[in-house]
Design a protein with these regions (language model features):
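Acidic/histidine-rich, surface-exposed loop or edge segments in extracytoplasmic proteins
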Residues: 3-11, 19-25, 157-180
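Short beta-strand edge/turn micro-motifs at domain boundaries
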Residues: 5, 9, 109-154
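Short solvent-exposed beta->alpha transition segments
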Residues: 8, 13-23, 37-91, 380
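Amphipathic alpha-helical repeat scaffolds
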Residues: 22-30, 350
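Short helix-adjacent coil turns
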Residues: 28-40, 356
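A short hydrophobic beta-strand element
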Residues: 85-106
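Juxtacatalytic substrate-recognition/specificity segment
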Residues: 160-288, 305, 317, 378-382
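Acidic/His/Gly-enriched intrinsically disordered linker/tail segments
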Residues: 237-248, 264-269, 281-408
Length: 408
């Protein structure tokens, strides 16, 4: 029998084993901060030569990261022991095999005010009384992927400006898809533009990550969708230890798509992603995509009439269904269909800001973002926030927006 709302997690192993695993993780964490290669590598079992090589490369790259803090915390209370019989058989020479969730928590000096928090699925093996880490990819076939960072892909180098830190892999030659030399200057100007829209306080030090290609990008994002239609991403970790807070805000570039952009295109993209970073701490579980993406586009184009040229041509051709885009329409369909959803969202938010003002929109966004996990759908909470801000619900807002398009 079970009661509603009550779940049972089987804790992996005796407390003495969990305590020993945590001590192992503490030593590994200290080795990262102390840049102690010997101590770091001593935490690794020698069962997989590939894993040992990857860990050696990881440590070498992490030396280039200015960590303000770094911790690994075993969390058996999350999902218990995830090791299957097949995982245990894989390490037949071990006395014991455990795969609990491990939280990786860290801060980059000068940029993170809260812990970035991500899950790692280490396989811990016990042999001759000693626990070590044997692998971090044994659960990939279950789509339980360990977090991958830019430094997992090899050595990195840093570039700085007043409010930005950019990490990328060293690369020279014509095959490199690296941002231009004026990239950080453009980022600084884009941030100033964003501040004219998002007037609420936010932490204005931003990290930009530049992977080598879409394969590395997809692994960092744990994405299964086609990334070719996307130039950059605003990425945040979710800290389950502190009420599902968004932390560890980053902008991650798609280098393959980025290289074809004009200077103005780069500026617009940066402003869009920075708006997401600026609003992230005010967002919440009931924020629809059209509100987020629409406001980012409004801030990015900053009143430029060309920003809605595609949408206007669609309307002129009679291709306008008078409906606000739904969340799934921003990630599925053709590139043209996805772009159309962004344009519709931009038009809707532009309508809101034009009629009721930017400050009213900021208040509306913050009110909607404050909605805690509670009964009711996203539509319910959105409807409630709209009524509080402008005196009309979702359906009436949608009709008013559509009418403004038809009568323009």
């Amino acid at each position: 029998l079970s009661s509603p709302g009550v779940s049972r997690v089987v804790l992996p192993g005796p407390q003495s084993d969990l305590a020993a695993i945590q001590r192992l993780l503490d030593r590994r964490s200290s080795a990262v901060l102390d840049r102690d290669r010997r101590s770091f590598m001593s935490s690794i079992a020698r069962t997989s030569p590939d894993f040992v090589r990857r860990q050696a490369r990881l440590f070498k790259a992490m030396v280039g990261v200015e960590f303000d803090s770094y911790r690994l915390v075993v969390r058996p209370d999350r999902f218990g022991d995830l090791a299957r019989p097949s995982d245990v058989r894989r390490y037949s020479g071990a006395d014991s095999v455990l795969i609990p969730v491990t939280e990786e928590r860290y801060r980059i000096r000068g940029f993170d005010t809260e812990d970035a928090a991500e899950d790692v699925f280490y396989t811990f093996v016990k042999k001759e009384g000693q626990w070590r880490i044997a692998e971090d990819a044994d659960l990939d076939d279950l789509a339980l992927f360990s977090a991958r960072h830019l430094w997992d892909g090899g050595r990195i180098e840093a570039e700085r400006s007043d409010r930005f830190l950019q990490y990328k892999h060293p690369c020279t030659g014509p095959e490199c898809d690296a941002p231009t030399d004026d990239f950080l200057d453009l980022a600084e100007r884009a941030l100033d533009q964003v501040n004219r829209y998002w007037t609420a306080p936010w932490h204005q030090e931003v990290i930009v990550l530049v992977p080598n290609g879409t394969d590395e990008l997809a692994r960092m994002l744990q994405a299964t969708i086609d990334l070719d239609n996307f130039v950059a991403f605003a990425y945040s970790t979710v800290d389950v230890e502190h009420d599902l807070d968004y932390t560890g805000h980053r902008i991650i570039l798609n280098p393959n798509a980025f290289e074809s952009q004009t200077t103005q295109g780069v500026f617009t993209i940066l402003a869009h992603e920075l708006l997401h970073i600026a609003t992230r701490d005010a967002s919440g579980p009931f924020m629809p995509v059209f509100v987020d993406e629409g406001y980012a586009e409004v801030a990015a184009y900053d009143g430029d009439p060309s920003g809605l040229s595609f949408f206007n041509s669609q309307v002129a051709n009679g291709d306008f269904d008078k409906k606000l885009p739904r969340d799934f329409e921003f990630t599925t369909g053709s590139g043209t269909e996805i772009y159309e959803s962004y344009q519709e969202a931009q038009s809707a938010v532009e309508f809101f800001v034009g009629r009721w003002g930017n400050e009213r929109f900021v208040d509306f966004y913050r009110a909607l973002g404050r909605a805690d996990i509670a009964p009711g759908t996203t539509r319910y909470h959105l409807d409630r926030a709209l009524r509080g801000a402008i005196g009309m619900g979702y359906d009436d807002f949608e009709k008013a927006w559509a009418s403004s398009i038809e009568n323009s």
